[in-house]
Regions:
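Structured beta->alpha junctions
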Residues: 14, 41, 68-70
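Short, low-complexity N-terminal intrinsically disordered segments enriched in polar/charged residues
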Residues: 1-23, 27-28
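A generic structured-segment signal
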Residues: 29, 41, 51-53
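A beta-strand edge to alpha-helix "cap/lid" segment located at domain peripheries
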Residues: 2-5, 36, 50-118
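Conserved short-loop catalytic and cofactor-binding motifs
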Residues: 10, 37-40
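N-terminal short leaders/motifs
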Residues: 19-25, 47-56
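Domain-scale activation on soluble regions of proteins
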Residues: 39, 43-44, 107
Length: 118
């Protein structure tokens, strides 16, 4: 990953989350990262993000298929499909994520899905 390539960074993010490499994943984010998901509490800071991936994420055994990545300045928009398990049950849904970069790190992340909550 290069600090100046948002597309490479977001693609690396999905690889790391699918491989459950959360230490490397969290390193892609700014220390004061803010992660927002409609209907869910906001996650603020690297430690809260790490805790979310280690303990609070309801999705498991899954993979992301990326359909599109669009970069405009310091923002990368990603559209894709997630397939995996939610609370032990098979699940598949579409998602759109927006990653805002500052100094080569993901500073803000917004996730939207075609489900009520994940």
């Amino acid at each position: 990953m290069t600090d100046s390539d948002p597309e490479a960074t977001v693609r690396e993010y999905y690889t790391l989350v699918d491989d459950e490499q959360y230490g490397d994943l969290v390193a892609l984010f700014a220390e004061d990262v803010r992660y927002e998901r409609p209907g869910q509490g906001t996650i603020e800071g690297q430690e809260a993000l790490r805790s979310f991936y280690l303990e609070g994420r309801p999705l498991e055994d899954g993979s992301h298929e990326i359909h599109d990545v669009v970069v405009d300045g310091a923002t990368a928009a990603v559209r894709g499909t997630f397939s995996g398990r939610l609370d032990g049950n098979p699940v598949e849904f579409g998602f759109a994520d927006f990653h805002e970069f500052e100094k080569g790190k993901i500073a803000r992340r917004y996730t939207f899905t075609d489900r009520d909550a994940v």
